């Protein structure tokens, strides 16, 4: 109920109707799932990114929010828990900016650069600094509460931020709601950093896989990779393609190398059409 009231209060303009020329999310998810080779598990979630507006009655806003929610789709693994790897950096960035915006913390001089590097270059030391500085576990809990993310939780081992848990449907919900839950300037910053993702990460890992390997230039993306929690290798990719949010979370056996995992995730991402002109 809290989320419904929140969505109604910001008076959404986006709705769940398919954009002309785009397949419906329920049609797209099976295509993406089928394009993933049998190397591991792929979770897929697709949603429409929402935008704030004005001029709707409460009833109309609630109806529109319901259509947006109904338009989201996922495969059988969309609600399965995965270690976040670097996806948690999105939560950290949003919560640091939110707490600074609401007067709950004062940004230090180096924080803006750390936040940007953490998203654009997937900089792990930057993430670790912010995690320790501002209580990362608390940040994950706070974001999960404010966005209604039921499958998202901090890591069991303190400090191991990449082992926080989330689901594809939670990440899709987060990116869908970002423009209407976060302050517009904060949402714009996060999405701008995602659009400016660097081909090589801070640690030298090539980020051009999954959605970053197939979506049009300038697409807002975030990549994640990690080995080897529970004997598995994880490779994740999320993006906002036009007005569509796409989340791909993958898990392969440790014996499957990054090259094969990257190729598999990129194959799945290639099934997603570009946005209409």
Question: Residue spans of the language-model regions?
Answer:
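Secretory targeting and sorting signals
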Residues: 1-20
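Penicillin-recognizing serine hydrolase domain
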Residues: 16-74, 131-277
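A short glycine/small-residue-enriched secondary-structure motif
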Residues: 61-62, 66-70, 93, 113-120
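Active-site SXXK
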Residues: 80-105, 118, 246
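Short, hydrophobic alpha-helix immediately C-terminal to the catalytic nucleophile
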Residues: 93-97, 128, 172
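Short, histidine-centered active-site or binding-site loop motifs used for metal coordination
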Residues: 96, 122, 250-252
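Conserved catalytic neighborhood of penicillin-recognizing serine enzymes
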Residues: 101-150
